[in-house]
């Protein structure tokens, strides 16, 4: 799920379904709009997969997408200002231009058991 830097919409647009453990929305409000003070209640949730959000601050990044059995699907180029939610399947990256990015994902980190590494190929099967 990619939100390009030039994406614009009115109001609040959620890109994720309610059952995703990581929610991603775009918000556009006029000056003076009030978002009421609030806090989020402590709620127990079960999270089975890590979902990551990447914000590209600077540079260019190629993202390769794989299905759950490591088959190559497609690639996309991310540029400065783009945001991506990696919600399922596998992914790999090639830095095309010097890169600065911010990664956000669920914790706590569980060490080596958190991910399975594999040899990726850009050939479709």
What are these language model-derived features?
Residues 26-48:
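Conserved short histidine dyad/triad with adjacent acidic residue
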Residues 30, 56, 79, 86-87, ...:
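A short, compositionally biased micro-patch
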Residues 30, 49-66:
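Glycine- and acidic-residue-biased ligand/ion/polar-headgroup-sensing regions
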Residues 37, 63-64, 84-86, 91-96, ...:
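Short beta-strand His + acidic residue motifs that chelate non-heme Fe in jelly-roll/DSBH
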Residues 67-88:
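Short acidic-glycine-tyrosine-enriched beta hairpin
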Residues 92-125:
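Double-stranded beta-helix
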